[in-house]
């Protein structure tokens, strides 16, 4: 009977270990799109601070994603998206103030 209890507890522990967060595909895609949009308006030139913040958060998020650390990756993908959107908006505003056509 003890071996039966040991098998059941082993099975339960392995099932608990299988519980995980699904890959954050939406957050990944939104961050990637925001990075590309910021790059398209030359945010690296016109909003370098926010661009660097976005790029660094995105780089770290992809590393965590590849390591299947999805909960941490979600936070960084969201941080990257927000920073990239701010960089894009700042770059657009600066370029418009300078009279550039976008």
Name each model feature, range by range.
Residues 16-102:
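Long, charged/polar, soluble alpha-helical segments
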Residues 1-18:
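Sec-dependent bacterial lipoprotein signal peptides
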């Amino acid at each position: 009977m003890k071996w039966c209890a040991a098998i059941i507890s082993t099975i339960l522990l392995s099932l608990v270990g299988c519980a995980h967060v699904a890959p954050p595909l939406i957050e990944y895609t939104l961050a990637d799109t925001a990075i590309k949009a910021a790059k398209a308006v030359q945010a690296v030139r016109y909003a370098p601070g926010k661009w660097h913040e976005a790029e660094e958060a995105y780089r770290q998020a992809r590393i965590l994603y590849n390591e299947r650390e999805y909960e941490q990756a979600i936070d960084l993908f969201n941080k990257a998206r927000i920073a990239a959107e701010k960089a894009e908006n700042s770059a657009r505003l600066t370029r418009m103030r300078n009279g550039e056509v976008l």
